[in-house]
Amino acid sequence: MHRGLVGARELVGEAYLADTELRREYESEIAPRTTAALESIFASTTIAAPRRVLDLGAGTGAAREMIRARWSDAEVVAVDKVPGPGILRADVTRTVRPIGVDGRFDLLVAAHLLNELPLDVDGRARLVQNWCRDLLEEQGTCVLIEPALRQTSRDLLAVRDRLIAAGLFVAAPCLLQGPCPALLRERDFCHMSAATIAQGRSRVDFSYLVLRKQGAPCTDTSRFRIVSDPMKDKGRLRLFACGPAGRLLVMRLDRERSPSNQLLDKLERGAVVDIQGATAQSDGLRCGRDSVLVRREN
């Protein structure tokens, strides 16, 4: 299952959940990663308790169960092209509104769905835009999760740019509401991480967007989200950070570590931080002894 969706990806676009063995493997290998990703997103993003939730491409129901556990009073409607217990059959590429689904929703979730649809980036962006237009309440939230592969992540970033151009607001993880700077170089992409789901297992990496119909853009050019793991080498510490000022490499020499910049040692992927007093260089920002770093809420 992992090879079919992440490796050679020969299962992408197939109705693999109709196969009993593959469904069992998906439930044990992939579904827990969906749960971990959603838990991480909901823990770091302010989302009002939803009254109605639509789970698009529900798979084996991991998102539905996680949402019910978090918001027990929510009505959760789940759809997938392969039906299951409590999951309606629906082909989300045929109509914007799945057959049998009425009304609007406070929360839309599409986990590991877009990359499996027979649509190009423009088609995926139009589909998400139509979901938000026809299915989402005015103050609602749409959460998209995709695999943290280079191409699937870059595709999601390209979808992001089109959605922003269409007037939607990216509440997370982006602090920048302009074109994504990670798309400027082919090797760059963007993903976040959740804790490991079991001892001996790798951490859960994922790419995601939290979308709303409107929002207040961040204009503080000193504010950044960390978008890489720490890189320590040759007496220095480096991290990539992204915000209204762009996607920059932040660097500090070990000999310039000080009480005001020591937070850099503790920053993890996804953290939001204000960086004051850093020196602009050709390849990014250099934090010196007098630079001041302050952690902010996500």
Language-model features: locations:
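Class I SAM-dependent methyltransferase Rossmann-like catalytic core
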Residues: 12-41
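Conserved class I S-adenosyl-L-methionine
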Residues: 50-59
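Conserved SAM-binding loop of SAM-dependent methyltransferases across substrates and taxa
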Residues: 60-71
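A short acidic, Gly/Pro-enriched loop at the edge of an enzyme's catalytic core
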Residues: 98-108
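A short SAM/SAH-binding and catalytic strip from SAM-dependent methyltransferases
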Residues: 106-121
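Conserved beta-strand signature within the Rossmann-like core of class I S-adenosyl-L-methionine
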Residues: 138-146
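Class I S-adenosyl-L-methionine
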Residues: 153, 157, 168-210
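C-terminal lobe and adjacent flexible extensions of AdoMet/dcAdoMet transferase-like proteins
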Residues: 193, 202-298
